[in-house]
Amino acid sequence: MKKIEAIIKPFKLNDVKTALNEIGIQGMTVSEVKGFGRQKGHTEIYRGSEYTVDFLPKIKIETVLPDAQVPQAVQAIIAAAKTGKIGDGKVFVSTIDDAYRIRTEEQGDTAV
């Protein structure tokens, strides 16, 4: 099993969700997060004063999948989230040792 974490632009969430649904992936956790990378922050003017906004709003999508589904899921996320501009985001893939479904006590791939 692998965990996919994708950090994307907020307005791309529906596109990514649709792309994952089209390949049969429905379970995911979505969080509003803030951060910066190469994009860095930007400057805003509020009531005549200039402020530097270091952290930019992003969306974090997490899903755990069987190994066989990972390449297709990663490609779907990239295709749906990509604008070609700085700040499109990142996709991280990590190994999950085990998973448990609390309600039924299923374990491993069947719990996902």
PLM feature spans:
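Positively charged, small/polar-rich N-terminal and surface patches that mediate targeting and assembly
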Residues: 1-112
